[in-house]
């Protein structure tokens, strides 16, 4: 790695059309898992002008019977969950309003051929829901053990949303994007060279005093989020660089579930296996294995075993045991990477890295997913049942295994 370089990451807000779709999909996951912790869910959402469409495959007790008939009242609950999600995001606009939008539900039963490969039976453990590779990452650039550019990009937009909802920035609307460029020296972020923030706004905030008010507000937020000394007179600012941004959200661009996988993870600072998270129950290793590898990488860094850690894991559909586990500390490790791999596999309280073991250890069979669907799945605060993959409760086990 070069000693001096620039690196950029972006985030998008909860009101971005793709994130609206992600949150709706995860609201459906939460609804179904709340009824049946073993529910199988693959829910895709399309959002566009005054319309939300669901499609995908589901299975679960109290949700749909084996003949594909919905349980009484469940279709109304699905629609209510969709509208409530859009309402909480804040869309009450002519082109997209939680109360007046048209809703279509095309969810149907899960394929029996997929189910037979995934379900546990007899002496066979539950298999992975699909083949694939998943990555986890952690580094010591921020207190959250996340790459700094994506961490700051998320926090900027989260602050905008908080201020919009509590009335401190009533001129803001839900759709926004951020992008932060940092200069690194000797592998550490030391300065911000550029900030891009595009935020949907009320009428009139694209010129004159109102535009100046919006720009000044955004600069205050960014200055509050970034570490002292990162901003300077040399920092380039691009705030609503295209001008007017009144039409936004699904009315401005169609949204789809699973199109912001780099925003959801590490902002391009680490590899990605390609699988999206939202709309998937935790038997899908695209989701659960990405969570466990983040958890493991974060605990490696938190234990002081490395300052950077990438972990890859791979699965085959219908097979419970992972095909491979790979640890790379990028030359920052205090012990051999292979020893860390061995320690992970030997830690008894993990219970292994099968899909069932991951879900059990992290407590993933709970309705905890909608909150993860905006502002990043990683670098969040583990609180109660939420974001269990952000816990650092494996630190002492790793230290003991490698002593």
Swiss-Prot record:
Enumerate the cofactors the protein uses.
Mg(2+); K(+)
**Positions with a binding annotation for K(+):** 44
What does this protein's UniProt record list under function? Answer: Catalyzes the formation of S-adenosylmethionine (AdoMet) from methionine and ATP. The overall synthetic reaction is composed of two sequential steps, AdoMet formation and the subsequent tripolyphosphate hydrolysis which occurs prior to release of AdoMet from the enzyme.
Q: Name one GO cellular component term.
A: cytoplasm
- Annotated L-methionine binding lies at 57, 110, 253, 284
Q: Quote the protein name from its UniProt record.
A: S-adenosylmethionine synthase
Q: What CDD domains does the record tag this protein with? A: S-AdoMet_synt
Give the source species: Erythrobacter litoralis (strain HTCC2594)
Q: Which reaction is catalysed here?
A: L-methionine + ATP + H2O = S-adenosyl-L-methionine + phosphate + diphosphate
Sequence similarity:
Belongs to the AdoMet synthase family.
SUPFAM superfamilies membership: S-adenosylmethionine synthetase
Pathway(s) where this gene product acts? Amino-acid biosynthesis; S-adenosyl-L-methionine biosynthesis; S-adenosyl-L-methionine from L-methionine: step 1/1
Q: Which Gene3D superfamilies match?
A: 3.30.300.10
Instruction: Give GO BP annotations, semicolon-separated.
Output: one-carbon metabolic process; S-adenosylmethionine biosynthetic process
Q: Where in the cell is it found?
A: Cytoplasm
Cofactor binding comment, as recorded: Binds 2 divalent ions per subunit.
